[in-house]
């Protein structure tokens, strides 16, 4: 299953294709891998990250595991503040990752049999547009456990700050202080 990241500023797509399960842990892992990619373009202020995400799927706005994994893999490990804005159900067609990245990938591989990881990755990497879209693709050969649970103590330990408008869909996760 693919997890896509679209950099609006640089018109670049990054697709992480997992051979395990589409889980919140996989979604956060893909974003952390993108952030760590030495070849990705840099931004002036890299102490914050804005994620525009669908309300469903592995980055579901109701999943505590998604929030916990963002806390651990992004905010804590990378030392960044992460603001997440979810698109309401049924509005994902307005999400740039859908109309600027996945729609182009779908056109590129339309009607082609995707019978191996290499073929799939090469079609994703070969996706380009007249506006200069470039796409990188990576295979994530790792098992992500389904149905992991987040305990009440783990929830309480999150540095989760809901935003005033639509707090279920818009929130900030801040790094926790290092304990040593």
Residue ranges and their predicted role:
Residues 1-52, 56-57:
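Electropositive, glycine- and tryptophan-enriched low-complexity nucleic-acid-binding patches
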Residues 54-66, 88-94:
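Acidic, metal-coordinating catalytic cores used for nucleic-acid/nucleotide bond scission
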Residues 76, 103, 107-111, 126:
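Short, well-ordered loop/turn and helix-capping segments at boundaries between secondary-structure elements
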Residues 30, 34, 65-70, 100-105:
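Alpha-helical scaffold elements adjacent to nucleotide-binding pockets in ATP/GTP-utilizing enzyme cores
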Residues 111-180:
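C-terminal accessory extensions appended to soluble enzyme cores
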Residues 84-106:
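RNase H-like two-metal-ion nuclease catalytic core shared by retroviral integrases
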Residues 66-84:
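Two-metal-ion acidic nuclease core segments, chiefly of the RNase H-like superfamily
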Residues 48-55, 84-89, 123-124:
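Extended hydrophobic secondary-structure segments that form protein cores and membrane-embedded regions
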């Amino acid at each position: 299953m693919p997890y896509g990241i679209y950099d609006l500023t640089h018109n670049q797509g990054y697709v992480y294709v997992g051979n395990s399960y589409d889980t919140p842990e996989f979604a956060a892992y893909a974003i952390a891998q993108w952030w760590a990619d030495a070849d990705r373009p840099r931004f002036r202020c890299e102490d914050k990250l804005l994620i525009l995400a669908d309300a469903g799927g592995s980055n579901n706005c109701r999943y505590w595991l998604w929030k916990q994994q963002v806390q651990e893999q992004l905010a804590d490990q990378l030392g960044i503040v992460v603001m997440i804005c979810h698109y309401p159900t049924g509005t994902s067609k307005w999400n740039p990752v859908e109309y600027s990245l996945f729609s182009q990938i779908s056109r590129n591989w339309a009607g082609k049999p995707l019978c191996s990881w290499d073929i799939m990755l090469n079609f994703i990497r070969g996706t380009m547009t007249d506006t200069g879209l470039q796409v990188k693709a990576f295979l994530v050969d790792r098992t992500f456990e389904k149905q992991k649970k987040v305990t009440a103590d783990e929830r309480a330990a999150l540095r989760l700050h809901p935003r005033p408008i639509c707090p279920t869909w818009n929130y900030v996760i801040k790094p926790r202080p290092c304990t040593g």
